[in-house]
Each structure stands twice: as structure tokens, then as C-alpha cells.
Amino acid sequence: MPKAGGSEWATLWIIDALENNKFPYFSWFDRNNLLFAAPAPLPAGSDIPPGWYSVYHAFDEECDRVYGPSPVVGQTVYGRFGRLLRGTRRAVVRNDLRYSDTFGGSYVVWQLVRTPFKNCTYCYGAAYGPEKLQRFIQCLLSPPMQTTATRRSDTREQSYEEAGAAAPAPPKAPSGLRGRPRKSNRYYNVGDITTEQKAACSVWIPVNEGASTSGMGSSGTRQVTQASSFTWRVPGDPPAPSTLTGPSDPHSSGAGLPGTAPPKPQHETRLAGTVSGVSGVAQTPGDTGQLAPPMRDGSRLPSTSPWIPACFPWGDLPVTGWWPQGASGLPEKVHPPTTGQFDPLSPRWTYTGIPSSQLNPAAPSWIPPHAQAGTFVGEFSQGAPLAPQGLLPQSGQCASAWLPRRETGAEGACGASTEGRAPQGAASERVYPFEPQPPSAPAPGYAKPSCYNWSPLAEPPATRPIRAPVWHPPVGHAVVPEVRTPLWIPWSSGGAPNQGLSHTQGGASATPSAGAPPTPEVAERQEPSSSGIPYVCQGDNMATGYRRVTTSSGALEVEIIDLTGDSDTPSTTVASTPLPVSGPRVFQPTVLYSAPEPAVNPEVSHLPTELERRECVCPGSGERPRVPLVSTYAGDRYAVGGYGPEQSLVPPPLGLPLTLSNLQGEDICTWEEGLGNILSELQEEPSSSTRQATDRRRPRSRSPHGRRTPVSHSGPEKPPSKMFFDPPDSQRVSFVVEIFVYGNLRGTLRREGDAGEAMLCSWPVGDTLGHLCQSFVPELLRIPRLTVPSPEQMEILNRVFEGLGHGFPIFCSMSGIYSRNATQVEGWWFGNPNSRYERILRSFSPRVPQQLFNTARYLATTAAIPQTPLSVNPVTCGTVFFGASPASTENFQNVPLTVKIFIGSIWDSLH
């Protein structure tokens, strides 16, 4: 029995029968469109003309020859023909073209489908197949791959994540078990880092919110242990409705809304961690009624007290501002239902149902809740948690009930803590979940608060600060009412900023005060600080200027009021710009933060290093702090203003890109970058008490400040900062090719660059009907074989053609000509898109795609020389030399094959 083969023979057999008219009633219907007519079965009892089914009988015999004999019992005469063509997609029936002749015979019209042929060198080359050429366009248009070494553990973790994306969520781990530290695809998982490190400092870092990773369920929420910290979704994205409704177990249902069971962040859920909003939170009231969250000792608040989540992001605020007040103290234009609800038509959560007795109508609407409670909290991002006003910890109450904190070994204001030992009830992770705590009496005297505790005391601790933001009221989504009270930021042009700043261990932050800025008399009465905070230094503490930041109708205004003038009226400088618009949401939250910069000594002429910036050395006499003010908006950075040794109080124009020119060399990073740097320090740096011992045990080369430089083996996946050429446009254009053999022009080819279209192959002779060369991705320049009289030269030329294989791949777009040396023959090309390499012959790289011609440079050159006629080509298009390096760009008689490629429009203008 012959071996079963493919179905290519069927197309060839049909085309041969049609071209030679081998069977009656079997002919072309439209040859150009590959349409042919075959006789249809006649009804029973009708007269069958002679030879009506001859084509089907011959086809059955050919099938028996190729595939072997087959039984014909129960098979119609035309059944095998139709099954083979339909099953192999060699042809399709065109029922819309069925017709009958004058003798009553009915005909079925088929249309051949163009397919590749095995005997085509271009379709199935020995060394180059269609798959390789199809990958070429992806390699050409994609940026270079990262060469960063990947650790084996990272590769294993990635395989786990890929396997877990399609797997169901594993069973919940017991609370006593501790998960293995892992890193997300984009940023460090802070909770995992704090699990292993002694100094547990919780900082919020965005994580990869794409497909579900290992250990995630269908909602995308990873089941984590108590060691893992919470994460926050992108502000402004609406939480998707959850499928969890009516839970019977309060710990298995994520609660967090009035009338639902409380969350259990110890080992089950991660609040507000993914696009689904508050992860694991039931979107409908549960059957358990209003349950208060558990205390750390296991007790609960009275069930009559509604549980208001203290961890909703800014983008979920009902309206603009912190708490715009109505007559009853509730937010304006918000009808207070009994439970929180999600409005599918509005991209925000509406948290209502707050009793008016728990609100403070007398408080200014724009002041942050934590500012009303006492001071400021260290690190936040745009998705920072906010505590409702009614449930704010008051003076002396433990702040860790609302925000995570880290212990520094000192006696905290909210409980005792010793070095190396976590407080009771927090195990050893030192990451405190969001749980309300009963009020406790304030500690007698002054006690240094922990990094994230609130402190009603005015004196800040003398410890190394961490970058802290200066808050600004967020801008809402759709409605942007005018902020009633501006935010005054003390600003100094001489000694230091004013003491109106409230300090914490996490850094210095502005505690806004309503109304007009303080007068110089008020500023004089404020005592100078002896802290190591870089914002305040010894000496003159007189504020010489104030910066007022307001938002009105979607515009950001920065007003500088200079108090140093001689006149009674202070000078005012106002800079205003509309806030940018991003996506379907009209506005997103805007955060103004002050990135701490080290002191700058005028006598030292060097820019501070990154470690120096992190060290935040307190400026002394003769030194001035540099605190640039930056607005982080929708992932972009805008310079709002700042001063340095050479700058005045007038801020630069808003909307300028953050470059070294407008910030005078100051390295300002985004929230993610800044927090990532802090994380790198925390990961590499042990606790303060054991750092010296660690340094003695590991004598290595240190930085000037005694801190190891963090080294990351596998960083986040980011696009390359600089491309070696401009990426091509998606629009394909026609191109013209001139072919030279040993320096003599032998022919000109013109090809139309239709995107995504393949061309009919003309090999071996003439047009092969029904053949589609699928290797034509991208444009494949098939150079015809040419001959020369010299046998020696002809032998070299044949080797070049064999090395070229089926063609030379090029990609022509509006931006230029791109190619890659996907051939076996050695090649050179002339010039480079970079003017630095102009008129230099460069060898092809077998792996890197290259730009042979830059349209922008050509147009710039022609515009610079308007008198030069277009017939003179000032910039040579893509010229490729195959087989030998030319003696010069003008003399290439020694090159066996030369190809000059022009973009069609440029060729038309030149000739």
C-alpha cells in the first residue's frame, strides 16, 4: 500500500484537468479568481449524459493510487471529491454561483484556495521556512531583548506563576504557616521582604495586576499569610462586582462594607489589591448583619457600630476633596443609604451611611483626616488608605489601628516594643493589619513614635527620615468643584522653611492651615527645631515666602507670596495650568509631594549621589536645603517648582517635562521609583542595632556612608531606555530596487508593500495557479538569477545566490527601510541612520535588525539644500553589497551583487 501523502496533489490534479480540458462538463468558471464548475448529481430517473461523472471516477482512481483502495459501499460518486476538498481546505463551494445550462444540467461552482506548495523553494526552503520568516517581522518591530541575567529561582517562580494562572486557588494556608518570600513581576512585594528582614517597614508598592498568579483564585486575589502586606489597585479603576454574596463564615467572605462580615487579613484576603476593587469583599450585604471588625485580642465592637473600611483608595472618594460638608455633616450630593454600594455607571465607590455624630462638621473640608487627628503618616502613594473621620484615632490612641507601622526599638507611643521583638499579637512579622484598637492612655512624657505612628507632640525624633509627601487635596473624577480653602506651604528663600511643618520620623510634612498664611510675627514665635530633619536647620527660622496650591475648575495654580519685600504688600507670583486629561476619566487624583534633597555646600561643586540623597544629612550653617516640589499626575511628572542655590522662588512653567535642564540636575523619581529605592535599602540594610556587627562580620567595600550598594540580578521588565534606531511605522509603502552585478546595472524592480498581503510565487516557471507563497512576511525581495560571461565570476555569483536562498527580507515604511541579514552570504551596507556613522561601510549583524535608510534624515537634508536638484541623491538609500566589501561607495566593481533600495515616493521624485 502506498504511503499516505498530503493533499497538495489534489490542487495540482484539478488545475491540470482544467487547463488541459481532460473531462467533459468540467471547466473554468472564472480562471482569474480560481473558480471552476463541476457537474452536479442529477435527480433519479433523469437521463444522464455520457461522461457526466467522468471527472469523479477519475478522481476516485487517483485517490486510490495515492491513499490506497477504499470501499465504495454507501458512497456517492461525488462524495469523495467533495470531502477531500472541504476537509483539506483546498477548495470551497460557492452556492451563490450555482447555475444550470440550456439542457437542464446543473453545475456546482468551486473556488480553489491558495496554499503553499512543497516543491516551492520559497515556501519550504531547506534552511529557511515560512515560520522563520514570520518571526522576522516580530523581531524587527520589537525592541531588543533584555540581557539582564535571570536567577534560577526567578525562572522557577515565573514557571510557577504561569502554571498557577490556569490552576484553581489552593486551599487556604493556616495562620501559623508563613509563606515563602516572593517577588511580583514588576515591583517588590513589600510584605514578603518584611517577612525576612528584621526592620519591618510597610510601604505600599503597586504590583502586577495582570493575569492571576500562583495562589490566586478567579478574582485575582492571592491567598497570603499574615506576613504579606496589603496592596492597592490603580486609583480610579472601579472595583468589579464580586461573586461572593451572603457568606455564612465571616472569615471566608471578605467583608468591609456595612452589613457584611469583616475582612480577615491575617491569612486570607488582600484588601483592595486588584482590579476587582476591595479584593474578596462582598458587594452585597451579607446574612450576618452588621458585624464590627475583630480586635487584636479577639473581641469585637458593638454590632450597632457600622464598620467603615479604612483602606479605600483616593479614587473611590465620593466627591472631590476630603470630606465636602453638607448640612448634616455628610458629603454633599450623596444620599446616605445604610450600606456602601457600587454604582456600575460611575467609576467610584460611594461610602455612605456614616452617622453624623461621628463626623466633625466644624473641620475644614480639605484637611486630611490624619492631619485632623494629630500629625502625618510617613509613606503613601496615590492609592493611600484614608481613615473615615468618625473612626479616627484621637490623641493618645494607637495609630497602628489604622495604618501599618514599623518599630525602631524605642518605646513607641502606642505600646512597648523592644529591639528584635515584635509587640504582642503581631507574631514576628511586624506588619500590623488594619484593625481598630481601643483608645489607650498616652504615654507619660515624650516618647519617640514609630515610623508610621501619629504623634501629637511637636518635637520630631532625631532619626534618619524617609521620604514623605506633602499632601494636596485630590481632584475628583467627573466633577471638580473649587477647593474652598487653599493649602499653604511654608517656603523659605534664606535659612529654611517655616516651622509650620509638622514632623514625624518618616520625614517632614506640611500640616496645612486654613485661611491666609501666617504672619511674620506668628512665624517668629515658633521655636526652631533641633531635629535632624533636612527641612529645618539651625539659625534663622523666619519664613520669607509661602506657596499656595489650589485647584479650581480642573486647573492647578501655584502662587508664591514673597514676604521679604520692603513694601507692606507682599509680592505675588501665580502660575496656572490646566491639569492633563487621561483616558475616559476626566481627572485623576493629584499629589504634590516634597522629595527631600541633601544640603548643598556652595564650596563643593559636585552633584549629590543617590545614597547622599537618601542619607538626608541635616544642613548646617552655610548650607541650604533643596526641596523641589513635583506633581505626580497619572503616572507622569510635572515640575511644579523648587529652589536650589541658584534658583529663585518663581517656579518653572507647569507642564514642562522633568529634565535636567529645568531642575538643574536634580534627580527626581516617581513614586514607584522612590519607594523602590527605599525598599532596596530596607532589604539590604539590617536593623540599626545590628548594623555595626553585620559590618564587622562582612568586611566589604562600602560606600562613603557605610551602606552596601543594592544589586538587583533581575529588575522589573521595562522597555529599553534607548533604541538603536527609530521604530518603523506600521504603514507599509512601495519600494524600488536596482540590481547591480559587478558594478553594472542589470535591472530595476518595483514592489508594492501591501501590509499583511502575500504575493503569488512565480517559481519555477510561470504562474502556478492555486499557489500562495506564505513565506512572504515581510516583504521578501526575490532577486532573479543573473548571468555573467566570465566563468570565474559566475561561480562566485552562483554562491551568492545560493547564500541568499529564497530572498532578502526587507521592510519598507514611511519612516525608512529596515532589514536583517537573514542570509548565509556575507553582506555590507552603506551608511547609518546616525550621522555619526555617515558614509561608513558596516557589516550586517546576523541577529540585530538594522535600519538601512532614514526618511527623516533624507527630508532634512533635502530641505537644507533647496537648490540641489532632486535627481542628485544627497542621502543614499539602503545600499547592500553581497559577497565582497566594495573598494569605495562609488567603485563597487568587485562586488558580485549590489542592491540599492529606494522608497517608492523618493524614487518618483528622483527619477
From Swiss-Prot:
Low complexity bias (residue ranges): 211-221
UniProt protein name: Viral IRF4-like protein
PROSITE patterns named in the record: IRF_2
Compositional bias (Basic residues): 697-710
Biased composition (Polar residues): 222-231, 495-505
Region (Disordered): 147-184, 211-302, 494-537, 681-727
Classification of source organism: Viruses, Duplodnaviria, Heunggongvirae, Peploviricota, Herviviricetes
Chief location bin: host cell
Cell compartments where the protein resides: Host nucleus
Keyword DNA-binding: yes
Gene3D superfamilies (UniProt xref): Winged helix-like DNA-binding domain superfamily/Winged helix DNA-binding domain
Residue ranges of the annotated DNA-binding region, renumbered to this chain: 7-114
Known partners and oligomeric status: Interacts with host MDM2; this interaction facilitates the proteasomal degradation of TP53/p53. Interacts with host IRF7; this interaction prevents IRF7 dimerization and subsequent activation.
GO process terms (BP): symbiont-mediated suppression of host cytoplasmic pattern recognition receptor signaling pathway via inhibition of IRF7 activity
One GO cellular component term: host cell nucleus
Function summary: Plays a role in host cell apoptosis modulation by promoting TP53/p53 ubiquitination and subsequent degradation and thus down-regulating TP53/p53-mediated apoptosis. Works as a potential viral transcription factor to modulate host gene expression to build favorable environments for the viral lytic life cycle and greatly accelerates the induction of an immediate early gene RTA, early genes ORF36 and ORF57, late genes ORF25 and ORF64, and latent genes LANA1 and v-IRF3. Inhibits host interferon-alpha production by interacting with host IRF7 and preventing IRF7 dimerization.
Keywords noted in UniProt: DNA-binding, Host nucleus, Host-virus interaction, Inhibition of host innate immune response by virus, Inhibition of host IRF7 by virus, Inhibition of host RLR pathway by virus, Transcription, Transcription regulation, Viral immunoevasion
Tagged with keyword DNA-binding: yes
